[in-house]
């Protein structure tokens, strides 16, 4: 359980590295017991061009990344999966819930479950890509720009249901959904 580890619970900038290192060390021990010599994971070509500190742990531990090694992008992986009849091909990405909080904000199950419940409400009501990013008492809704009008049309119900979960201030991010939005500013701080 990653949140049992203080170094991860404190949510540092290298949280993903620490978590992946822990996860893959555990998997490596299990694989060794089973006689498995090679472990592979799902990093793709696109992941190599954005802030992904977990990739460092993958490389350090000698885990293979066949999709990235083949130069396959996320879209190419989705197309291949669809061609093979794999249902996950059309599923929206679901990154770690810790990405919904700013670095340094302490992680705990209660807040992560609350964010997850809020995202599920938004998925049911407006669909598409949805993230709730929590900044203290402000929760920022990220969704696809083409879903803004639907979000505003259902504004009162969205606000009511999110407040029932305990969110105080609810905003719609006019930049829309974007992967890695909590990493904005890391380069200027020399942390990416």
Q: For the regions a protein language model found, what residue spans apply to each?
A:
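Mid-to-C-terminal catalytic subdomains of enzymes
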Residues: 68-74, 78-122, 129-130
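Peripheral terminal appendages
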Residues: 35, 117-192
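Short secondary-structure transition/capping segments
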Residues: 7-11, 51-54, 101-104, 143-144, ...
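Short secondary-structure boundary segments
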Residues: 1, 43, 174
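Active-site adenylate/phosphate-handling loop in enzymes that bind or generate adenylated species
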Residues: 4-90
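Short, hinge-like loop/turn segments at secondary-structure boundaries
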Residues: 14-17, 56-59, 107, 150, ...
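Short secondary-structure capping/turn micro-motifs that flank functional sites
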Residues: 3-5, 47-48, 97-98, 138, ...
């Amino acid at each position: 359980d990653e949140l049992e580890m203080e170094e991860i619970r404190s949510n540092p900038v290298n949280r993903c590295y620490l978590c992946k290192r822990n996860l893959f060390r555990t998997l490596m021990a299990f694989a060794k017991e089973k006689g498995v010599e090679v472990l592979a994971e799902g990093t793709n070509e696109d992941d190599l061009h954005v802030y992904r500190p977990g990739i460092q742990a993958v490389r350090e531990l000698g885990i293979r990344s066949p999709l990235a090694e083949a130069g396959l992008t996320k879209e190419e992986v989705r197309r291949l999966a669809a061609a093979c009849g794999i249902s996950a091909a059309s599923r929206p990405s679901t990154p770690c819930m810790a990405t919904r909080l700013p670095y340094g904000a302490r992680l705990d199950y209660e807040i992560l479950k609350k964010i997850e419940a809020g995202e599920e409400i938004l998925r049911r009501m407006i669909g598409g890509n949805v993230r709730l990013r929590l900044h203290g008492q402000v929760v920022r809704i990220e969704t696809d720009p083409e879903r803004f009008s639907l979000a505003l049309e259902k504004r009162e119900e969205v606000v009511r249901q999110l407040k029932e979960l305990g969110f105080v201030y609810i905003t719609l991010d006019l930049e829309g959904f974007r992967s890695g939005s909590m990493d904005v500013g890391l380069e200027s701080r020399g942390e990416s």
